[in-house]
Amino acid sequence: MNAAFTPAATRALTDAIETASNTLLDRLPASEPFDFMRQFAQILPVRVISDMLGIETGDLDQTKAWSDAISMVVEPVAARGLREHSNRATIEMTEYLRAELARRRAHPSDTLLDVLIEGQRDDPSLSDDDLLANLMLLFLAGHETTTNLLGNGLLALLRHPEQMQMLRLDPGLLPLAIEEMLRFESPANVVARVTREPWRIGELEIPPGELLYCMTGAANHDP
């Protein structure tokens, strides 16, 4: 997976991401309200990830639905009754990606999926389940966080119109603005870890096997 996300490889994706972004933006109405989340933010990351993997455009809605269903149940506080739906989505998405692996082995191309398959040839210890786990992680971690960052970032600018005006006057500030959005309105505010050995934090003794939630969102605002 790392070989597909080197700085050089990531830069090569820039044109494709810009093209996908511009295509979606061109479809938005210029003189009437539209749903930014539904018509842009929710579509863009799934399209980019699918393009990276070489997944058929006609399957985008289904892969997004699976990703959404799985993501809902792994939240720190998940609503009851979602587990069965999430488990079914996990099975269906896994089988879909397994079929994609078989298809790509029979008909290789030049995508991230092919890079992973080639990596498996170089390291036979990697099983198909390992590849599928990485593909699932890419979908789950990649599409939801990007969607939420786009939505949170736009909302922050609407709440601070003077900052939006600064960006309009000087687009060169955009890289710094994106970094600040990641801090100020991060789409990921919790990191989960399980202790492997006894640990002590202040007066608190934490035994092995304990699930911890690290609130990075709080650290970003230095409470």
Give residue spans per PLM region.
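Cytochrome P450
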Residues: 2-223
